């Protein structure tokens, strides 16, 4: 890879200098409050800048990592080499008739609220999902009986060559916590949702109910990575973990939540290594006790810390 100072000069010639940060600590951008530094942390505000960065990185063989709002991800303390592209500044939300077009970095909660404000129904389920639009499409996020595939019209993505590709709902191949975005290593830049006219009092009542249920059941008072495991067929991950007597089990500063066994919370300056070790322990115990494999929903990226 090129020297850091050479990459910096190249980037300054490609994109606005004020969106470039060098050796940027990533823990401030994740819900777990863990993670080392990024060699380069870039915050583009336009799709064209994303394309320019991706094409440059491809040409120079520099690895690229994308970050949304860091709600369902663990970044290791060794940090991330190459370029990290933050999508948070791609945060426009435009409403027209029964459609909403939102940038990848928009919070899906804010899109849900925009739908409510325009008396549109269909996104109430997302009122408590902490992720970004890009992350929500990436994993077909869902909650309380609704999921992204129920309401998305299309997504505009960028591929590893820096080309823009638009995918319809069907072409996105949205499945349980999966999509073509994952399979083809794409990144969502924008998504459009088609909703239905509703009644404001009914929309608000549903959102209030879902918010209350979320706040009463989830450990929102601590840093966490959200739901750690996918739902195994025929089971609930949280119930299996609870029945394995693992609630409150701690590795370092991270423990299985006493409030909801499907969550792991950072209660005392925990590290990404603590999270990983705890995840492996829980997987091992549940496998031994119930012969059920727990697969991670949370993404783990970055390098392990040097010894």
UniProtKB/Swiss-Prot annotation:
Function: Cell wall formation.
NCBIfam families to which the protein is assigned, alphabetical: murB (TIGR00179), PRK13905.1 (NF010480)
One Pfam short name: FAD_binding_4
Pathway membership: Cell wall biogenesis; peptidoglycan biosynthesis
GO terms, molecular function: FAD binding; UDP-N-acetylmuramate dehydrogenase activity
Cofactor: FAD
Enzyme Commission number(s): 1.3.1.98
Family: Belongs to the MurB family.
Reaction equations catalysed: UDP-N-acetyl-alpha-D-muramate + NADP(+) = UDP-N-acetyl-3-O-(1-carboxyvinyl)-alpha-D-glucosamine + NADPH + H(+)
Keywords associated with the record: Cell cycle, Cell division, Cell shape, Cell wall biogenesis/degradation, Cytoplasm, FAD, Flavoprotein, NADP, Oxidoreductase, Peptidoglycan synthesis
Active site: 177, 227, 297
Top-level division of the source organism's lineage: Bacteria
Gene Ontology BP annotations: cell division; cell wall organization; peptidoglycan biosynthetic process; regulation of cell shape
PROSITE patterns named in the record: FAD_PCMH (PS51387)
GO CC field: cytosol
UniProt protein name: UDP-N-acetylenolpyruvoylglucosamine reductase
Residue stretches making up the FAD-binding PCMH-type domain: 34-198
Localization (cell): Cytoplasm
Major subcellular site: cytoplasm
């Amino acid at each position: 890879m090129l020297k850091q100072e050479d990459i910096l000069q190249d980037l300054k010639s490609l994109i606005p200098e004020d969106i470039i940060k060098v050796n940027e600590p990533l823990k401030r951008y994740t819900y777990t409050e863990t993670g080392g530094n990024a060699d380069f942390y870039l915050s583009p505000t336009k799709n064209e800048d994303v394309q320019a960065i991706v094409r440059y990185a491809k040409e120079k063989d520099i690895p690229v990592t994308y970050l949304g709002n860091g709600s369902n991800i663990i970044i290791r303390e060794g940090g991330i080499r190459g370029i990290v592209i933050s999508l948070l500044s791609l945060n426009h939300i435009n409403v027209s008739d029964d459609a909403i077009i939102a940038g990848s970095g928009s919070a899906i909660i804010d899109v849900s609220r925009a739908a409510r404000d325009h008396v549109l129904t269909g996104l109430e389920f997302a009122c408590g999902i902490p992720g970004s639009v890009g992350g929500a499409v990436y994993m077909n996020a869902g909650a309380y009986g609704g999921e992204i595939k129920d309401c998305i019209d299309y997504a505009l993505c960028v591929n590893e060559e820096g080309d823009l590709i638009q995918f319809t709902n069907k072409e996105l191949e949205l499945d349980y916590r999966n999509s073509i975005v994952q399979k083809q290593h794409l990144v969502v830049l924008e998504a459009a949702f088609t909703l239905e006219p509703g009644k404001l009092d009914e929309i608000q009542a549903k959102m209030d109910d879902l918010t209350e249920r979320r706040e009463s059941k989830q450990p929102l008072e601590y840093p966490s990575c959200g739901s750690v495991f996918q739902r195994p067929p025929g089971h609930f991950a949280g119930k299996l973990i609870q029945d394995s007597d693992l609630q409150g089990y701690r590795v370092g500063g991270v423990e299985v939540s006493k409030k909801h066994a499907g969550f792991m919370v950072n209660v005392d300056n925990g590290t990404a290594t603590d999270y990983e070790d705890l995840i492996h322990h829980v997987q091992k115990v549940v496998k031994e006790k119930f012969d059920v494999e727990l697969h991670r929903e949370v993404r783990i990226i970055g390098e392990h810390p040097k010894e």
